[in-house]
Every structure is written in structure tokens, then in C-alpha cells.
């Protein structure tokens, strides 16, 4: 694969080898004060990719019912990748956010609404000015119920786009979750640590219709 061909997905055989050593993870979330790794009893996990993970993580940590969030990499092949490796396009991973949430306070359906309404799901291997396979739109369900909800929400959002006169093809990947690798600490809660930092995500002005 050409070094500059960042919009072309690689194969597993082409992926960088990675490493066995996991990325160090801070014990506590800078904003919520909760564990960055534990999932308390009764809580659930969701994985979303919708462009640069700095802005995406901030979207989700601000929601009532969200226990913690983490920026990381998933959907590809390279184990325990670095940010530089992911940005090379040679890991197959997307920049993603892991959301731990209380389903008694906020539903997976409500998380899907935030997902669809806050980025452009029809841009292929980019999001705005951020170009590369790592910026693709993706939902990585962890359960059959999440997968069914994700697929149904895609169909509803497609219909809403068409009703608004937008007939572009939705390129959002919906695939069973692969291992999630935490990003380096400097990327965790980045826009809390750097309030004036870059945030390149934004919606297209279309709302996700509610379930029938």
C-alpha cells in the first residue's frame, strides 16, 4: 500500500505487527472521576467511530447516564497500536470512543441518536478535513441487540436524509466489535485538558427519527 493512500483499507496481511504490551491507562476519568477501565454491574458498553476521537469523546462524556468514556482504536488488525501507527493507515483501525453507560438512565437508542446527528455518515474514509481510514464512520455492536438497533437506526437515518433531499450513500460501517485498544493518555479527555483544541466533527442537520 502506498504511504499516501490513506483512504484505502488494508488487509490483515498488510497490517503493522503491533506489540503485546498494552498502552498504560490512567486509573480515573479526568472529567467524571470514574474508572477508565471498569464496567460497574448493571452498566453497558458501546463503541462508536465518527471522526477525530477528541470531539467524539466530549460529546458522550457530557451525556447524563454516561459513566465514563475513553478514546482508542478498534475495527482493525494491529494489536496495541500507537497513534502514529493508526494515522499511517497501516493498522486498519478507526479512531473510536468506548462509552460506559447506565441503561436505566440513557438507552443505547439515545446514544445512537447522538452518533447519527453529530457527524456526516456519508463521507467514506474521512470526516471533514480529516482524511484517512481511521476517520471512518462506524458502529461496533457488542451484543446482538445492539447490532439490531444499529442496523434499524441506519435505515431510519437513511430515510430521514432522503426526506431532506440528501441522497448520498451512507458509508457507516456496522460490524461486530473487535478488541478495543486505549489511546495514549494525551488523547484521553483531550478537549477537557485542551479546551481550545481542535474539534472537527459536526452533523448534517438531519435528525434520527424515533423508533416506530
UniProtKB/Swiss-Prot annotation:
EC number, as in UniProt: 1.8.4.11
GO cellular component, one term: cytoplasm
Catalysed reactions listed for this entry: L-methionyl-[protein] + [thioredoxin]-disulfide + H2O = L-methionyl-(S)-S-oxide-[protein] + [thioredoxin]-dithiol; [thioredoxin]-disulfide + L-methionine + H2O = L-methionine (S)-S-oxide + [thioredoxin]-dithiol
Gene3D superfamilies in UniProt: Peptide methionine sulphoxide reductase MsrA
The keyword Oxidoreductase belongs to this UniProt entry's keyword annotation: yes
Keywords: Oxidoreductase
Active site per the UniProt annotation: 52
GO MF term (any one): peptide-methionine (S)-S-oxide reductase activity
Entries under Pfam families matching the protein: PMSR
GO terms for biological process, alphabetical: cellular response to oxidative stress; protein modification process
NCBIfam families assigned to the protein according to its UniProt record, in alphabetical order: msrA
Family: Belongs to the MsrA Met sulfoxide reductase family.
Record function comment: Has an important function as a repair enzyme for proteins that have been inactivated by oxidation. Catalyzes the reversible oxidation-reduction of methionine sulfoxide in proteins to methionine.
This protein's name: Peptide methionine sulfoxide reductase MsrA
Species annotation: Cronobacter sakazakii (strain ATCC BAA-894) (Enterobacter sakazakii)
Taxonomic lineage: Bacteria, Pseudomonadati, Pseudomonadota, Gammaproteobacteria, Enterobacterales
Gene: msrA
Amino acid at each position: 500500500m502506498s504511504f499516501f493512500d490513506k483512504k484505502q483499507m488494508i488487509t490483515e496481511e498488510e497490517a503493522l505487527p503491533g506489540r503485546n504490551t498494552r498502552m498504560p491507562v490512567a486509573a480515573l476519568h479526568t472529567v467524571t472521576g470514574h474508572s477508565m477501565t471498569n464496567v460497574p454491574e448493571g452498566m453497558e458498553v458501546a463503541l462508536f467511530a465518527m471522526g477525530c476521537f477528541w470531539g467524539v469523546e466530549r460529546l458522550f462524556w457530557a451525556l447524563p447516564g454516561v459513566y465514563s468514556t475513553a478514546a482508542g482504536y478498534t475495527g482493525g488488525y494491529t494489536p496495541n497500536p500507537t497513534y502514529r501507527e493508526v494515522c499511517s493507515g497501516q493498522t486498519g483501525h478507526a479512531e473510536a470512543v468506548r462509552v460506559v453507560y447506565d441503561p436505566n438512565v440513557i438507552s443505547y437508542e439515545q446514544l445512537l441518536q447522538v452518533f447519527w446527528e453529530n457527524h456526516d455518515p456519508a463521507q467514506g474514509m474521512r470526516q471533514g478535513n480529516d482524511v484517512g481510514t481511521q476517520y471512518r464512520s462506524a458502529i461496533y455492536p457488542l451484543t446482538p441487540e445492539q447490532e439490531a438497533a444499529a442496523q434499524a437506526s441506519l435505515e431510519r437515518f437513511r430515510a430521514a436524509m432522503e426526506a431532506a433531499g440528501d441522497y448520498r450513500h451512507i458509508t457507516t460501517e456496522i460490524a461486530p466489535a473487535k478488541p478495543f485498544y486505549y489511546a495514549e493518555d494525551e488523547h484521553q479527555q483531550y478537549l477537557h485538558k485542551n479546551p481550545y483544541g481542535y474539534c472537527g466533527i459536526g452533523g448534517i442537520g438531519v435528525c434520527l427519527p424515533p423508533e416506530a
